[in-house]
Amino acid sequence: MSDLDKQIEQLKRCEALKESEVKALCLKAMEILVEESNVQRVDAPVTICGDIHGQFYDMKELFKVGGDCPKTNYLFLGDFVDRGFYSVETFLLLLALKVRYPDRITLIRGNHESRQITQVYGFYDECLRKYGSVNVWRYCTDIFDYLSLSALVENKIFCVHGGLSPAIMTLDQIRAIDRKQEVPHDGAMCDLLWSDPEDIVDGWGLSPRGAGFLFGGSVVTSFNHSNNIDYICRAHQLVMEGYKWMFNSQIVTVWSAPNYCYRCGNVAAILELDENLNKEFRVFDAAPQESRGALAKKPAPDYFL
């Protein structure tokens, strides 16, 4: 059994790696991720997953429902970290799987894969608490800069964390972005990670999030038509049923963190696409209390409130 396989087994038990192992893993991951496009090509069959947010034991439920990697080909739409108790183990397991099976798992960047955001919503504090220094946070946030911004399944399904941008009409414009940087406060790269579809908006609207935009059905229709895609698949917003279609099935939100923040009471979903792009949503609940680690039984920290 290789060192990497041992580390994967260890991470599957929700046991953190040594700092030196994290550093080496991140360096290996960087070599793989640097080769990926801003619009990374993904072949079907594939299973698409939304936000995880450090909910490690719920991600284990996800793998129970969807199958283990590499048997199942996975695409994760970002927001691996923050808010949950196990951001370190969650992100490192996904990263280790990426290094071990680079063609069977695709990771794209969410708005929480950012230095600034993780200093507010938990990942920075978790790294400090678990390692006694900021080094692991630094290695991981350096990797965030290398994550792709979007994916394209069989040239037909455009997958992104947040949504669209008024600065982007074509996929080639996304391909031209220099992604290897902290998420900017505005502009195309920011919008892809922060924007949301909104029923009551026609065209573009201001986002209450303070970053990105709200966009209406006409924007989606025109983007899908211009780029010859069937629909957009995105995450970024909690939906109580785990997934939600909008604008005559032109865009779907997939949310994969059940009972979000350990209190929202929502179910989660993943989207399974077969080789002909037929869809099946698999809905699942949070992991039962007895299968969780000791940490999750503690009261929620302040930033949930």
UniProtKB/Swiss-Prot annotation:
Catalytic activity: O-phospho-L-seryl-[protein] + H2O = L-seryl-[protein] + phosphate; O-phospho-L-threonyl-[protein] + H2O = L-threonyl-[protein] + phosphate
Chain residues that bind Mn(2+) 1: 51, 53, 79
Coiled coil: none
UniProt keyword terms in alphabetical order: Hydrolase, Manganese, Metal-binding, Plastid, Protein phosphatase
Domain of life: Eukaryota
Cofactor, how bound (note): Binds 2 manganese ions per subunit.
Protein name: Serine/threonine-protein phosphatase PP-X isozyme 2
The protein's enzyme class: hydrolase
Tissue: Ubiquitous, mostly expressed in root mersitems, flowers, and vascular tissues.
UniProt-listed CDD domains: MPP_PP2A_PP4_PP6 (cd07415)
Organism: Arabidopsis thaliana (Mouse-ear cress)
